[in-house]
Structure formats: C-alpha cells, structure tokens
Amino acid sequence: MISLKQYYFDKFKWSLMALASSKKKKKNLLPENSMVGEEIVLEYEEAVGENLERIHEYIDITEKQLVLLRDLDAYISGKSGEKYAYLWLENSSLDDSEWQEIRRLAMAVILAFH
C-alpha cells in the first residue's frame, strides 16, 4: 500500500510536470474536451494543499525549493477570480503569456529538485 507521503509526492511531481509542459503535451494528459488548465491546477492544489501545508507535512523540501514553490503558488493564486477564468476554462489560453509564466515558474521548481 502506498503511503500518504508517496501519494502526495507523486501527485506533486505529476502536477509540476504538467504545469511545466507545452500546450500540446498538457492537452494529451487529460481526456478530450477537458478544461485542461483547471484540471491541472486542481491536481496541483490537491498536491500542495492550502498554504502549502501538504508540502510541509509530506514532502522534504529545502528553503530554496520552498521559495521557488511559493513564487509559483503565489502566481497561480493571483490569477483567480472572474477576470482570469479564461485561463483555467479555455484551452485556447494555454499559450498565453500567463501560462508561459506558469511553465517557467514550474520548471524552476522542478530544476531545484535536481
């Protein structure tokens, strides 16, 4: 049986890789007609928890990694509300500058783990 620590770490890795991937790769990760941005961000949010509490509880993380993760988390959190609904609900937005920044921030977190 998989431990909670392993479960959340695997979900964390998957969500970071999905956030960092190109529009084409993102769309291939989920069933056709999915709201890709929303689904990936929901997976990420489930992995890290509110205020990153799951990270602190289940994942061993350095201060540098945590700083980069906080940057990503703050950026995603800052794109909430009606004004940014298109980012999460419209697959055509996956190439927009906001998603390019999410990819860059997610890749920085990934690289910090290597």
What are these regions (language model features)?
Residues 16, 20, 73-76, 80, ...:
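A structural signal for well-ordered alpha-helices, especially hydrophobic packing surfaces
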